[in-house]
Amino acid sequence: MIRRRRFGRAEVRIPAIGLGCYNLTADRGVDRDTALATLQRAYELGVRFFDTAPMYGDGECDELLGLAFGHLGADEVLIGAKLSGPPGERFGDYRRESVLRVFDRTLRALRRDDVFALQVHGFASPRDIPRQTAEWRALYEPGMAFEALLELKEQGACRYVGATNHNSVLLAEAVRHFPLDVVEIASHYNITSHVAPLTLLPLTEERGVATVIANPIGGGRLVSLETYRAATYLGAVPLDEAVGILERLMRDTGLALYELALLYLLHDPRVTCVIPGPRNVAELEADVGVADRPALSDEQAAELARIGSRMLARKVPTESDVEVVGVPLRPEWLATTT
């Protein structure tokens, strides 16, 4: 059974394992029958939080959730939707009028009048921190996405508002600027990256902001030791040492690497929900199955935390990089790669 956790400062608890739905679209090579069967099985297994966005499959992800759950009430299925410009434009037209038009299409596709959570959809430019920062901060301006987000909450189109990004420092900045209820971070918190626990989670804990972890299996690199070795390595310890830690913990616990990855995040009480992205029923059942596994010990979680990179992007951050995102440089962020 999936245990529930409090959704930030709200008086509501949600299952700690949700579903990232992008991988169920044709963009990711999944046919509609498989996608709908996976969504239905997820609901049967106790998953209630479903993450979607207009960008996912050019609106197909929203449509799938509408087909699967449009007949269910707002308390039966918790939709985590995104506020963005037209699909395919990344940081394209995020003006208020544009994102409101796109959100209207989202509601029609979902077959709903409102959603559980609505988040400004941020994208990463991991090799260009100044550009990413400028694009993100433009959304703070009057007449842009964050203004529209808060208006929609006032109108009752969503219960909770938030933001998503691959850069946890920029998410922390948004939490300081706006009365957000939830953030969703990808890339900066999993076994391969330990940036969000340093930059974002202390703030979300302090302010009672729910924290959703996307990409918990590191874009597939944490499925197995084979995929881990094959991926570009950016850890805080030498690769051989990291593999040794993983091999030992897998042997001691009897867990697969993807199970370690999910349980590592669930060990952190500041994490509200993790949203793996399975492509079929078998992968879904494997992901949700970790709910029945014993929790990691503090010592085991600490061993895994040693592996994760402290880098803000795919390079060691420089003084100028950190100055751009408006936070003081910390020595632990300067981990070298091997």
Role assignments for model-derived ranges:
Residues 13-17, 46-48, 73-77, 112-116, ...:
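Short, well-ordered coil/turn segments that N-cap beta-strands
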Residues 109-131:
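Active-site groove signature of glycoside hydrolases
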Residues 66-81, 141-151:
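Alpha-helix-loop-beta-strand connector modules within alpha/beta enzyme cores
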Residues 7, 19, 35, 50, ...:
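Conserved, mostly hydrophobic/aromatic
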Residues 29-42, 94-109, 166-173:
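Short, acidic/polar
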Residues 26-30, 53-62, 86-89, 96, ...:
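Acidic-and-aromatic substrate-binding clefts and catalytic sites of carbohydrate-active enzymes
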Residues 123-315, 321-338:
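Beta/alpha (TIM)-barrel catalytic core signal, keyed to glycine-rich beta->alpha loops juxtaposed to Asp/Glu
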Residues 1-78:
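N-terminal binding-site loop/beta-alpha segment at the start of enzyme catalytic domains
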